[in-house]
Swiss-Prot record:
UniProt xrefs under Gene3D superfamilies: 3.10.170.10, Neutral Protease Domain 2 (1.10.390.10)
Domain of life: Bacteria
Pfam families, per database record: Peptidase_M4, Peptidase_M4_C
Chain's gene name: nprE
Similarity field: Belongs to the peptidase M4 family.
Activity under varying temperature: Thermolabile.
Annotated organism of origin: Bacillus pumilus (Bacillus mesentericus)
The name this protein goes by in its record: Neutral protease NprE
């Protein structure tokens, strides 16, 4: 049965949690969404197999033990990301079909990554020197969930330019969910201020202009053509767009482009055209021209 409780986050804050009472205990299963879509959070207990793991539970309505903090953040943040997509775009879960949204925390040991696996999210705990537990950042959770949205819409191939666009759209929706700064991952990085910046990609060794696109090998070692590197170029174009048009219009333009116009093999130039067309569809030629200028400024 649906219930409400609270939990302690990685940073020590107390947050409200939508939970469920089942089998004589409280579990991190959010049954509060009017659509009936469930958000469920599991613990892999440092395994990297047999996903999703054990449903996070408590004998009381409070989730306060230190081993539960990563789960509290994952559960709370994902509830916010679900609400963001539903309230702004009427999108019901990543697939718009109300599929349950699953996270597993404590993936592996000192694992320095978070990922969308195709049907759920996984979060490592970080090694403590580069990353702290990766569920502690709202923009990272939004980034991963957006990979799910992309998979079900444009389905951008994860290599070269389409892959860099896949990464960029995840960063941009990460920003739309956490607009207090232009950084991505600032709440989980230990040794540097953030992972990436939309306003200043070069701060984290990313190009911010097409003239500096890096042709990297399409291998695991080469980050599949540098998808996490070359995303700096469309990220800077997004920053330019948002500063010209504001969040409210920009997020509608980006969502329309992703869900209506982009295809698996879209290039940066295709993305520019898709975003210009989306702006024209929604807001007319003046705003479309501002989007065009935002991309011209990064050499595209």
């Amino acid at each position: 049965a649906a219930a409400t409780g609270s939990g302690t986050t990685l940073k020590g804050a107390t947050v409200p949690l939508n939970i469920s009472y089942e089998g004589g205990k409280y579990v991190l299963r959010d049954l509060s969404k009017p659509t009936g879509t469930q958000i469920i959070t599991y613990d892999l207990q440092n395994r990297q197999s047999r996903l999703p793991g054990t449903l996070v539970s408590s004998t009381t309505k409070t989730f306060t033990s230190s081993s539960q903090r990563a789960a509290v953040d994952a559960h709370y943040n994902l509830g916010k990301v679900y609400d963001y997509f539903y309230s702004n775009f009427k999108r019901n879960s990543y697939d718009n079909k109300g599929s349950k949204i699953v996270s597993s925390v404590h993936y592996g040991t000192q694992y320095n990554n978070a990922a969308w696996t195709g049907d759920q999210m996984i979060y490592g705990d970080g090694d403590g020197s580069f990353f702290s537990p990766l569920s502690g950042s709202l923009d990272v959770t939004a980034h991963e969930m957006t990979h799910g949205v992309t998979q079900e819409t444009a389905n951008l191939i994860y290599e070269n330019q389409p892959g860099a666009l896949n990464e960029s759209f995840s960063d941009v929706f990460g920003y739309f969910n956490d607009t207090e700064d232009w950084d991505i991952g600032e709440d989980i990085t230990v040794s540097q201020p953030a992972l990436r910046s939309l306003s200043n990609p070069t701060k984290y060794n990313q190009p911010d202009n097409y003239a500096n696109y890096r042709n990297l090998p399409n291998t695991d070692e080469g980050d599949y053509g540098g998808v996490h590197t070359n995303s700096g170029i469309p990220n800077k174009a997004a920053y330019n767009t948002i500063t010209k048009l504001g969040v409210s219009k920009s997020q509608q333009i980006y969502y329309r482009a992703l869900t209506t116009y982009l295809t698996p093999s879209s290039t940066f130039k295709d993305a520019k055209a898709a975003l210009i067309q989306s702006a024209r569809d929604l807001y007319g030629s003046t705003d479309a021209a501002k989007v065009e200028a935002a991309w011209n400024a990064v050499g595209l």
